[in-house]
């Protein structure tokens, strides 16, 4: 198999794709698709492990043993008799202590060191902010977060006026990061909120497409004003 002859770095993207397809099947509540996608994800796990074994890195038993040890270590309130009566707040403190020990074992001394770089950007932003907030680096109230968004918006407008694409990209990223922070203070997961909005946009745009095509017309030949009218109709038609 040519896939097996490639290095681990060549196939990890496929693993990520399969994980997203698993998540998609779960959100659609399509259990037949979920069964198939879990199989595809498992296949990628086996692929990675086989490649690692051929390169004398580790084998499947090592993987199983590692996750078993991690589960026991991370959940003493489940696997340890003496820890089962601890309060939720104490369990959280214990969790932070355990994670700190794990980071130390990996020579990760920084609070943010083990936040995976390849996470989706919105997900990683939220994790970074939560991790920083745990050690007190956080705005005390939402008003200051809103003021920060205003500041970043002004800086983005200024960058646009100077026609510096590099600066525009930087300031736009800062604005997005601040919006994720606002969501965190409101108890909103930005990734999930945006996914919901994407689905809503898709449904409404399909309504426009179907309405126009049912009259034998083409989208690109339809005036913007008419598409906007259909958009407003779709909001009411799809609200139930």
Please tell me what each predicted stretch does.
Residues 15-23, 31-53, 61-68, 145-159, ...:
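An amphipathic alpha-helical micro-motif enriched in hydrophobic residues
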Residues 89-106, 220-240:
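C-terminal domain-closing interface element
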Residues 54-123:
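Charged mid-protein connector segments
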Residues 215-219:
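A short, structured beta-strand-centered segment in the mid-to-C-terminal lobe
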């Amino acid at each position: 198999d040519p896939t097996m002859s490639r290095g681990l770095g060549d196939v990890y993207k496929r693993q990520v794709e399969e994980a997203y397809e698993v998540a998609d099947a779960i959100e659609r509540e399509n259990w037949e698709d979920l069964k198939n996608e879990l199989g595809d994800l498992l296949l990628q796990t086996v692929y990675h492990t086989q490649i690692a074994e051929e390169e004398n890195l580790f084998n499947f038993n090592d993987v199983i043993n590692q996750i078993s040890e991690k589960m026991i270590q991370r959940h003493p309130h489940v696997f340890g008799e003496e820890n089962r009566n601890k309060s939720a707040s104490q369990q959280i403190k214990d969790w932070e202590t355990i994670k700190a020990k794990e980071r130390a074992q990996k020579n990760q001394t920084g609070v943010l060191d083990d936040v995976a770089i390849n996470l989706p950007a919105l997900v990683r932003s939220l994790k970074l902010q939560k991790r920083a907030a745990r050690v007190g680096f956080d705005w005390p109230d939402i008003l200051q977060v809103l003021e920060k968004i205003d500041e970043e918006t002004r800086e983005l407008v200024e960058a646009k006026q100077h026609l510096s694409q590099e600066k525009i990209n930087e300031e736009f990223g800062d604005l997005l990061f601040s919006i994720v922070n606002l969501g965190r203070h409101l108890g909103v997961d930005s990734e999930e909120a945006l996914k919901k909005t994407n689905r809503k946009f898709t449904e409404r745009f399909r309504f426009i497409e179907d309405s126009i095509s049912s009259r034998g017309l083409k989208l690109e030949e339809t005036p913007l004003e008419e598409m906007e009218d259909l958009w407003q109709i779709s909001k009411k038609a799809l609200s139930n």
